[in-house]
């Protein structure tokens, strides 16, 4: 399992590198090599590490370990075919951790990034209303049961495409350089992670790699079913390329516009699930 954890981390970082490369090529720039995020992780691992004088030492260090821990747990939950509710609970916990990152440093940039993380959560989390549609069809929120259902009834992406779109938007909101990346806006330098440097930033890179891998793996298992491992990796690459196109071709929204757009999408999803429920009964 340790080997798979390492693989998930490095492949997730490779996916983020592909993401940056595709965005650069769309914008007619050469861009960094696709292994750039992996190099970043190693680079920060050997740089000087410190805790700012204005920071809360315990919180400043603890949030990095918590961030890695919760996404490691999420990976094992997915591999074990556990409940989607646990994955979504970890996602919500990650928003709290992001807020902790911002508060821990004492930096105004970090604080604003942490506040924006809470603002974004208000609109992202309701998108999980899409799980209601999944439960209507599969009668379960267990990933293993959802995979079993698709073996006999076909991929859920064909049965409930709007739920897949809602989950896709959740993933878009966690991708760097995307329209909903308000927690990392240029006016905030690096947002909530501005003051985390050295080994702490390397820990954040590990967290980002795991998070990317887990979210894409969950999306594929829930909407495409239990595909072979090689096919799953190929699908991850294809999905990350589509995400890169979305991020490259759409402007970063303001916090207000980001919440407004995602709230409207949530409203559409509520109506969609209500229609499915009425039709199903």
Predicted regions: what is each one?
Residues 1-281:
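Alpha-helical transmembrane segments of multi-pass membrane proteins predominantly involved
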């Amino acid at each position: 399992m340790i080997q798979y954890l390492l693989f998930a981390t490095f492949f997730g970082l490779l996916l983020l590198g592909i993401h940056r490369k595709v965005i650069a090529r769309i914008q007619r720039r050469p861009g960094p090599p696709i292994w750039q995020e992996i190099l970043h992780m190693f680079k920060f691992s050997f740089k000087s590490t410190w805790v700012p004088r204005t920071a809360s030492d315990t919180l400043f260090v603890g949030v990095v370990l918590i961030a890695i821990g919760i996404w490691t747990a999420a990976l094992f939950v997915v591999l074990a075919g556990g409940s989607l509710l646990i994955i979504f609970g970890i996602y919500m916990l990650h928003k709290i951790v992001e807020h902790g990152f911002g508060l821990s440093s004492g930096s105004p940039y970090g604080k604003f990034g942490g506040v924006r993380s809470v603002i974004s959560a208000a609109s992202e989390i309701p998108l999980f209303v899409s799980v209601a549609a999944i439960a209507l069809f599969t009668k379960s929120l267990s990933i293993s049961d959802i995979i079993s259902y698709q073996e006999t009834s076909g991929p859920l992406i064909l049965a409930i495409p709007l739920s897949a779109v809602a989950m896709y938007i959740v993933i878009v909101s966690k991708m760097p350089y995307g329209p909903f990346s308000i927690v990392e806006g240029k006016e905030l330098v690096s947002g909530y992670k501005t003051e985390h440097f050295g080994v702490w930033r390397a820990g954040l890179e590990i967290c980002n790699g795991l998070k990317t891998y887990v979210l894409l793996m969950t999306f594929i298992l829930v909407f495409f079913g239990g595909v072979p491992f090689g096919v799953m990796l190929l699908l991850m690459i294809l999905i990350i390329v589509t995400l890169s196109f979305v991020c490259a071709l759409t402007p970063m929204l303001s916090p207000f516009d980001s919440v407004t757009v995602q709230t409207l999408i949530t409203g559409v999803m509520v109506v969609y699930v209500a229609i499915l429920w009425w039709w199903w009964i």
